[in-house]
């Protein structure tokens, strides 16, 4: 009798619409219960039985129950699952398999089976890619996944690389394909094979894509020719190799090895500017005045060169600093190094006065054994030879940005707009509390940004600089010319690494159109989206492999008295993140390690400080001594403790 009763249906509808609901993200805990985080301020308790319906990170709608002043959430509807495609470790064998996702907050094994057509017999400990197929909030009885790809066996020494590349769905090896002959591009190539071009790289570099030649001119001027490898002389637009490069967008540099954007035959041989080999190049000739200004007579042209020497960063730096026993092989090469050092000094001073110069941070290099074991991690400071190449490349990229802007009005540009306008007032208020007065409007201009950066660089510590970083916008890749506030430049377009960046290949093709006086087609915006996404994935892959290797490297230091100097990089409610100065590893110091009495401790992300009993005990950018308390291999996390 109640079956089709409209009154009953109406009552049900009313009850449903009157029941309070909330949408948010599930946060799991180690204890079995969880929370529905609605926003930064509001969260609801999810009891353990209800947590069985959801997974950490799921975005859900839940019914909110109130009992005895306590609110709790009952998951009702799945908005967006946290897991779709993931990597994990297989448990069990053959007919009864489960997979544990490789994620610090997902501990439960998910029942699974191998997808049809996947010819691998999975064993305990195997690593696999899986895709979620069932979810309790979708009306299924339980979670269920399908194994779609075998990655490798459990104790493969190279697990960090293979698992990370599979996680981010990135290629494991160089692209297939060969380039048989150079294209006829209708370019007249200037013969510069007699000039003393040199390359400066790491000793192990095979893909040399830039060579330099300098010459003194009258009136204290200097000429610089930057010659860049020319892969677009071999790879036609729209060809199979071009399409593969477009998808990869960059060479992926991971600790220990790289996965090139182009076939190795091209990147490490045909296009590589090897010593004593004739190579086609795209070149830029520029004149620098006595104060380092790039004069207006910038010239881009096609050429052939023959590098006369493969020089190594450290050897060149030692020689210029009058240490070490390396000597240039001839007076002509020595003269090149001296002139290039002069150009570097002039350009460095010009950028210091008219643009912005980054503070030098060391690069950290992993030294690996045959089986991927970490033998050592060394900090490689940026020395004079690194700066010679850097200044030459920045100058060449400024030239390309100008020429593409003035001749075509488009290109592939690196654009950085400084501070987000929405943050300008908050930024000015924060700086004011530290005694720096800036105009909220002015700081959004290139000049205003540069002025502030110089004031911050003059501060005794980097504390204030670290505080304002969160107000900055991100750098973007754009087809429109625009300023790069981070470099303090009106426009910046890279073309100096075409072997390893697809955007630089595009700029090569555009510059060649300018050289030939032809019209060119504006690059499509989709390509900038693909490049930005690939850059993000490659960076995450580099970080993930690094975390794994750092955990391996520091495992035997856990629980010992070995001290490490560590810079505080971030402070949150739960504690502090620090970077070990000698090797670059990131470690976490939990709040209880800072002070035993929780009520006397205030960790403020907002202020970048830790206060104990009202006194500032630690702040971001402080360098403190720590020991390694624990290394958790399953999550690749390093827990440190301050030395008392």
Swiss-Prot record:
Residues 561-643 form the S1 motif domain. GO terms for cellular component: cytosol. It catalyses: Exonucleolytic cleavage in the 3'- to 5'-direction to yield nucleoside 5'-phosphates. It is found in: Cytoplasm. The keyword Acetylation does not apply. Its EC number is 3.1.13.1. GO terms for molecular function: exoribonuclease II activity; RNA binding. It comes from the Bacteria. It holds the Pfam family RNB. Residues 189-516 form the RNB domain. InterPro entries: CSD, NA-bd_OB-fold, RNase_B_OB_dom, RNase_II, RNase_II/R, RNase_II/R_CS, RNase_II/RNase_R, RNR_Ribonuclease. It is an enzyme of class 3 (hydrolase). GO terms for biological process: mRNA catabolic process. Keywords: Cytoplasm, Exonuclease, Hydrolase, Nuclease, RNA-binding. Involved in mRNA degradation. Hydrolyzes single-stranded polyribonucleotides processively in the 3' to 5' direction. Belongs to the RNR ribonuclease family. RNase II subfamily. This is Exoribonuclease 2. It comes from Escherichia coli (strain SMS-3-5 / SECEC).
